[in-house]
From Swiss-Prot:
Family statement: Belongs to the GTP cyclohydrolase I family. QueF type 1 subfamily.
Higher taxonomy: Bacteria, Bacillati, Cyanobacteriota, Cyanophyceae, Synechococcales
Catalytic activity: 7-aminomethyl-7-carbaguanine + 2 NADP(+) = 7-cyano-7-deazaguanine + 2 NADPH + 3 H(+)
Pfam families xref list: QueF
EC code(s) of this entry: 1.7.1.13
Protein name, as recorded: NADPH-dependent 7-cyano-7-deazaguanine reductase
Annotated positions binding substrate: L70, E71, L72, H89, E90
Gene Ontology terms describing biological process: queuosine biosynthetic process; tRNA modification
Keywords: Cytoplasm, NADP, Oxidoreductase, Queuosine biosynthesis
Main location: cytoplasm
Gene responsible for this protein: queF
GO MF entries: preQ1 synthase activity
Length: 135
């Protein structure tokens, strides 16, 4: 059996990991200290819900953790789960923020979805949760 025959026959392991993705957290090692965590995911893709064309973006997450911290590999898999999903820029930014907040319950969180220009239009969607404290 060739590789292409095998891949047509069953779900690839990467597809399986993405479809099973759930956001994982671990205990904050310094819960009594106010600090920020900055994460950038530069290869985000989804599909335009109107044209079906691919949209590409850099997702930037900045947050002040509470009792839990987001685990990076699970975030990557979660973000990759949007690859074949038809979703607007605004909806994806709000959905991701809601899901990250539900998982980690941060003191403060901001998510920025910086989409590549298309048709001479550059869109950046910024959403936030909670009140930011000085570090």
């Amino acid at each position: 059996m060739t590789i292409s025959e095998k891949s047509n026959e069953s779900e690839l392991y990467g597809e399986r990991f993405i479809s099973d993705a759930e956001i994982v957290c671990f205990p904050n090692p310094s819960p009594n200290r106010t600090y920020e965590i900055s994460i950038e995911l530069p290869e985000f893709t989804c599909q335009c819900p109107f044209s079906g064309y691919p949209d590409f973006a850099i997702i930037r997450l900045l947050y002040q953790p509470g009792e839990k911290v987001l685990e990076l590999k699970s975030m990557k898999l979660y973000v990759n789960s949007f690859r074949n999903r038809k979703i607007s820029h605004e909806e994806v930014a709000n959905k991701m923020l809601d899901d990250f907040v539900a998982a980690a319950n941060p003191s403060w969180m901001q998510l920025e979805a910086d989409f590549n220009p298309r048709g001479n239009v550059h869109t950046v969607v910024r959403v936030s949760h909670g009140l930011k404290n000085n570090c």
